[in-house]
Regions:
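Beta-strand-rich N-terminal accessory domains
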Residues: 9, 13, 21, 33, ...
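Extended, charge-enriched "interface" segments that sit outside catalytic cores
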Residues: 20-98, 105-109, 153
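Structured loops at beta-to-helix junctions and adjacent beta-edge loops in soluble globular domains
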Residues: 69, 77-81, 208, 323, ...
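Aromatic-lined, polymer-binding surfaces characteristic
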Residues: 86-88, 93-97, 103-301, 316
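Residue-level detector of short, conserved catalytic/binding motifs and their immediate flanks
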Residues: 113, 161, 224, 400, ...
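CBM-like, beta-strand-rich accessory domains located in the C-terminal region of large
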Residues: 161, 323, 330-333, 348-364, ...
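Carbohydrate-active enzyme catalytic cores, enriched for enzymes
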Residues: 266-446, 498-501, 506
Length: 585
C-alpha cells in the first residue's frame, strides 16, 4: 500500500489501537517469521486415490463464476480466474492488494475447503471407501502444499477459522471417532497430518485477533472457529481458548448487531455469512454442553426476525453495502444456493418458531447437517406462518421495509437511512445514505449496483461503493463520505430519522455539510394504489450540481412515455416512474 494509505489508516486509530498495531506487527513480522524459518517442512507422500487416478472421473464444484474439479489434484495457490499464482513464501510478506498474483479472494475461496463436506457426505451416504481416500488425499495435499505461515492461505485469519469449522463438520460426517478405532490408515492420517493441521489452525486463530477498527466479521469468525475447535478437538490450552472464544462471541453478538437485530456493518450480503458463525457456534455449544447465555439466544432471535423481514417473497435481499458471495458451510454443491432461506429454516427449528418458517421454506443438506433427523421433525411440525405481508420498520437502525403482499403479488421497497458502516473505517459500507431498492413480485427493478471487487481495479471499486452507484442524490460529483482506501472510509456521515408514520418515513444526512448542502428524503407508500411518492429536499445558500440516478436490473426493459418511464419485466407487473418536470433526464 502507498504511504498516503498508511497515513489515512493511522488517522482511524485510537491510542490503544496504535499500541496494539505495534504488538501485532511484532507478532507477524518478527515472532511469526522466526517460527516460519525454524519450521520443518512436511514431506508426506500423497496417498493413493482411485478417483484421482481415474481419468474419466470428474465433479465440478462452483467457485464464483468458475469451477474446480474436486476429483482431480488441486493447485492451492492458483487464482483460477486470472490463472496467476501466488508465491510460496512467508505469508505476511505477500502483497494481496494488487493484481500481481491475481485475486487472493479466488484462491481463498478454494482453500476454505467447503467442498470437503460434500466429499465426506458422499462417503457417509455410499460407504464407498474411494470417497474417504479422496478426502484424505485432498487434506494431505493441502497440508503438504501449505506449510505453517507459508503462502497466501496463512495470510487472513478468517480463512483459517472457516477451515476449522469445516474440519469440525467433516469430522462429524465421517464419524471419525469410530474410524480412528476401526481404520488404521485413517487413524495414522489423523494423528500425523489432520490433527497437527487443526492444532496449527487453532494456534493461529488465537494469536492473530482482529481487534479495534478491524473488529468486524473477521473477529466473529475467529471466535467462532476457535470455539468450535475447542469444543471438538484436543488442542493445546483447550479450556483457555474455549472460554476466550465463548466470551468473545457473547460480546460481539451484542456489539455488532443493533437492539433490533440489524448487523452494524451495513452490508446485507454479509448478514447470512455472519449469522452462520453465531448459529453454528450456538448449535455446537448445545451439542457439546457449552451453552451460550439467554441474552445470546435472545439477540440471535432478533437477528432471525430481521433476516425474515428484509427478504422479498422469492428470498431476494436488498443489496446494500458490500457482498462477496462468501459462505461458512456449503455441503450442497450448487451454484445458486440461497443461504438466506436456508438460515430461516435453521432459525425456525432452533427457536421452534413458526413465524420464521415461510411458505417456500427449504430443508437442505446444511440443515440436515446442523440438526439431523430431530431437527427435520421439528421443521415439519411447524406451520408456515413466516411469510411477511406488511411493512416493517427498524427505525432505530435506519432500515425501512415497505411491503404489500396479496397472493403472488408483492410490492417491496427498502429505504436505507442507516449509518455508513461499523467502526472507524466502516470497511464494508457504501456511501448510500437515503437510497432505496424496489422489487415487484420478487423481481428486482431498482437495485443497488453491487460490489464488483475489493482490492483490485481501484477505480471500479471507488465507483461501486460511491454515491452515484446508488438510488440517492450525489452533490457536486462528490461522495457522501471520503473513500481513503478499498475498505476504509473517512468523514462518515450521520443519518437522522426526522419523521415516521404507518406508511411513510423521512430522514436526512449531513454527508454534504462541507458543500453547504443538506438532503432530506421522504418516502410515502400508498398501498391502495401500489404507489410511492418520493420527495427530496435539497437546501443550500449557493448553487450546486445534483445528480439523481435510478439503477435498473439488467433484465428490466425501459420505455420513455412523455415525462415518465415504463419499466417492464417478463415476470411481474410493470413499474412506471414519474419525475419532477423540472428535472433533466
Amino acid at each position: 500500500m502507498s504511504i498516503a494509505w498508511y497515513i489515512q489508516r493511522f488517522r482511524t486509530f485510537s491510542i490503544p489501537e496504535i499500541l496494539f498495531r505495534f504488538h501485532q506487527r511484532a507478532r507477524t513480522h518478527i515472532l511469526d517469521k522466526q517460527i516460519y524459518k525454524c519450521s520443518s517442512k512436511s514431506n508426506y507422500s500423497l496417498p493413493e486415490s482411485s478417483i484421482i487416478q481415474n481419468k474419466n472421473a470428474s465433479f465440478l464444484y462452483p467457485i464464483f463464476e468458475k469451477n474446480i474439479d474436486i476429483f482431480k489434484p488441486i493447485d492451492w495457490h492458483l487464482d483460477i480466474q486470472s490463472e496467476k499464482r501466488f508465491p510460496r513464501k512467508f505469508s505476511h510478506q505477500i502483497n494481496i492488494r494488487s493484481d500481481e498474483y491475481g485475486s487472493a479472494k479466488h484462491v481463498w475461496e478454494i482453500n476454505r475447503l467447503l467442498f470437503l463436506t460434500y466429499i465426506a457426505l458422499q462417503y457417509k451416504e455410499t460407504n464407498d471407501s474411494d470417497f474417504l481416500d479422496l478426502f484424505v488425499f485432498h487434506v494431505t495435499s493441502w497440508v503438504q502444499e501449505n506449510p505453517y505461515l507459508e503462502g497466501v492461505n496463512w495470510y487472513s485469519n478468517i480463512e483459517i477459522n472457516i477451515r476449522l469449522i469445516n474440519f469440525y463438520f467433516c469430522y462429524q460426517i465421517l464419524n471419525a471417532d469410530l474410524l480412528r478405532q476401526t481404520n488404521s490408515k485413517f487413524s495414522e492420517f489423523y494423528e500425523k497430518i489432520w490433527r497437527p493441521c487443526i492444532e496449527k489452525h487453532a494456534e493461529f486463530s488465537f494469536k492473530h485477533p482482529s481487534l479495534f477498527s478491524s473488529a468486524n466479521n473477521h473477529l466473529i469468525s475467529e471466535y467462532a472457529g476457535l470455539f468450535v475447535a475447542a469444543c471438538a478437538f484436543d488442542i493445546k490450552q483447550k479450556e483457555k481458548k474455549l472460554i476466550y472464544a465463548k466470551k468473545g462471541l457473547e460480546r460481539e453478538i451484542i456489539k455488532q448487531n443493533s437492539l433490533e437485530g440489524v448487523n452494524r456493518e451495513e452490508a446485507a450480503e454479509y448478514i447470512q455469512f455472519i449469522n452462520d458463525f453465531f448459529l453454528i457456534a450456538a448449535i455446537v455449544g448445545q451439542n457439546t454442553n457449552h451453552n451460550f447465555s439467554e441474552n445470546y439466544f435472545k439477540q440471535l432471535h432478533k437477528i432471525a426476525h430481521y433476516l425474515n423481514q428484509i427478504l422479498d417473497q422469492n428470498g431476494n435481499y436488498p443489496m446494500y453495502g458490500d457482498g462477496d458471495d462468501g459462505f461458512v458451510l456449503l455441503p450442497d454443491a450448487h451454484k445458486h444456493y440461497n443461504n438466506f432461506l436456508s438460515q430461516l429454516s435453521s432459525f425456525a427449528v432452533l427457536f421452534k418458531d413458526a413465524s420464521l418458517k415461510r411458505e417456500n421454506a427449504i430443508w437442505d443438506n446444511k440443515n440436515e447437517l446442523l440438526f439431523g433427523e430431530k431437527g427435520n421433525a421439528i421443521f415439519n411440525s411447524l406451520e408456515s406462518l413466516g411469510t411477511p405481508n406488511r411493512s416493517s420498520f427498524f427505525e432505530k437502525s435506519g432500515h425501512f421495509i415497505f411491503r404489500k403482499k396479496n397472493g403472488n403479488k408483492e410490492t417491496y421497497l427498502h429505504f436505507d437511512a442507516a449509518p455508513l458502516g461499523f467502526l472507524s473505517i466502516a470497511a464494508h459500507g457504501h456511501a448510500d445514505a437515503l437510497s432505496f431498492i424496489l422489487h415487484v413480485e420478487g423481481v428486482p427493478f431498482l437495485i443497488d449496483s453491487g460490489t464488483f471487487t475489493y482490492h483490485t481495479h481501484k477505480e471500479w471499486r471507488k465507483y461501486f461503493v460511491g454515491t452515484l452507484a446508488h438510488n440517492t442524490i450525489r452533490i457536486n460529483q462528490k461522495d457522501q463520505a471520503t473513500l481513503a482506501g478499498p475498505t476504509m472510509w473517512l468523514n462518515h456521515y450521520d443519518c437522522q430519522i426526522t419523521s415516521v408514520g404507518e406508511n411513510f418515513a423521512e430522514a436526512s444526512h449531513n454527508g454534504y455539510k462541507s458543500e453547504g448542502v443538506s438532503h432530506t428524503r421522504k418516502i410515502e407508500f400508498h398501498p391502495e394504489e401500489d404507489s410511492f411518492t418520493i420527495t427530496d429536499s435539497l437546501k443550500s445558500k449557493k448553487p450546486f450540481l445534483a445528480e439523481i440516478p435510478f439503477h435498473l436490473h439488467p433484465k428490466i426493459m425501459v420505455n420513455a412515455i412523455g415525462a415518465s418511464f415504463l419499466l417492464i419485466s417478463e415476470n411481474s407487473r410493470s413499474v412506471q416512474i414519474f419525475t419532477d418536470t423540472n428535472l433533466n433526464y
